Amino acid sequence: MPPWGAALALILAVLALLGLLGPRLRGPWGRAVGERTLPGAQDRDDGEEADGGGPADQFSDGREPLPGGCSLVCKPSALAQCLLRALRRSEALEAGPRSWFSGPHLQTLCHFVLPVAPGPELAREYLQLADDGLVALDWVVGPCVRGRRITSAGGLPAVLLVIPNAWGRLTRNVLGLCLLALERGYYPVIFHRRGHHGCPLVSPRLQPFGDPSDLKEAVTYIRFRHPAAPLFAVSEGSGSALLLSYLGECGSSSYVTGAACISPVLRCREWFEAGLPWPYERGFLLHQKIALSRYATALEDTVDTSRLFRSRSLREFEEALFCHTKSFPISWDTYWDRNDPLRDVDEAAVPVLCICSADDPVCGPPDHTLTTELFHSNPYFFLLLSRHGGHCGFLRQEPLPAWSHEVILESFRALTEFFRTEERIKGLSRHRASFLGGRRRGGALQRREVSSSSNLEEIFNWKRSYTR
């Protein structure tokens, strides 16, 4: 066993002990994990929560009860009404986990440690970027499922882009979501950053926490391969910073139809500075050190590797890797000015469903870590808050998939139906306006679309990919 193997095994054993004793443990924020009641739900008993409350098309104060003790936080709108109706009909929310399985540490541990058996069949594609760096796209091609359901109009399966956590670990959560999405008729594809999960680091540059430049090129390439298919995106945990940064920077020009974030880290800087409970902090830190140790020689010219591998916290590791570089050192403040995932959140024009748990041991309690004002003020952001689920867990009794996966795919289906109805209404309006010169305007739009399509290949100045 390598020298780090014993340390990793010890950390996993401690996490297992935390999972078994979870209900008795107190989080680092001073309250018992798992004893928290959702805000606004203190006076409701379980029966009232399961009923879901008032009419589906009415909002009281931006927080609506859902089955299973969950609640939806959002700004009232037609889209919110559509999503609320879909969630209240969802069977996934009603089927809660077993009582002994609802501990936050146990759910989190199962998510990060237990494998999915059997795992999906992956076809890897390496994408060479504009600066000659490489990212990897793992297309889920199997196992083949009979009777796959088509997820969009016209018989074109939608593409589901999945973004793992920022540490590069391919977890049970990601693989389980891909298998379920494949069964439901999607084309799942997993995005891997530079140097993550076997993707070679061919240039001494890693992707900062919230820099979406590599993801932009990957999304454009996916769009090039599937120009007519709808594109949905899902991120887990710390990987949500990348997705939110992309949606904010691209705004209405994003190719994404809808997105979801599982246990997102929204206040990223505060999250790094406050630190995690020590078993998680040490576990994530050890995983990153092991992953980058193979590139220690290649990084020596740009990073103080001695300082990097001596770091004792996630913040020290992040600072050593991206702030204290030898060529262009920057301050911690400047780093987060460029990488805060919510820096351009007002520009996002894509519906985003965030699924969070009140007992999340990694992110912390929702009243400290969730920016609820974002969901109350922005019509594109929706927060599904549950009492239990841990960090990226939301597990149910086997062989049922995590209920978060079911809810995400159901919400995407509701979004598809909503947009299809909106397009039908707009189509009728355009048909009525055709007698007022709409014919000439339609011709101009058609010419612009053809021109855009003909110039699409010019976007790919790299246009080089490798498969294996």
UniProtKB/Swiss-Prot annotation:
Keywords (A to Z) from UniProt: Phosphoprotein, Secreted, Signal
Main localization of the protein described in the UniProt heading: secreted
Signal peptide positions (record): 1-23
Active site residues per record: 360 (charge relay system), 391 (charge relay system)
Entry annotated with the keyword Phosphoprotein: yes
Gene3D superfamilies, A to Z: alpha/beta hydrolase
Subcellular localization, as worded in the UniProt entry: Secreted
A molecular-function term among this protein's GO annotations: monoacylglycerol lipase activity
Highest rank taxon of the organism: Eukaryota
Record flagged with keyword Plastid: no
GO cellular component: extracellular region; membrane
Region Disordered, residue ranges: 33-61
Gene Ontology biological process terms from the UniProt entry: adipose tissue development; lipid catabolic process; lipid metabolic process
Modification sites for Phosphoserine: 434
Protein family according to the UniProt entry: Belongs to the AB hydrolase superfamily. AB hydrolase 4 family.
Subunit (UniProt): Interacts with PDE3B; this interaction regulates PDE3B's stability and expression and, thereby, impacts the antilipolytic action of insulin.
Function: May regulate adipocyte lipolysis and liver lipid accumulation.
UniProt name for this protein: Protein ABHD15
Organism name: Homo sapiens (Human)
Lineage of producing organism: Eukaryota, Metazoa, Chordata, Craniata, Vertebrata
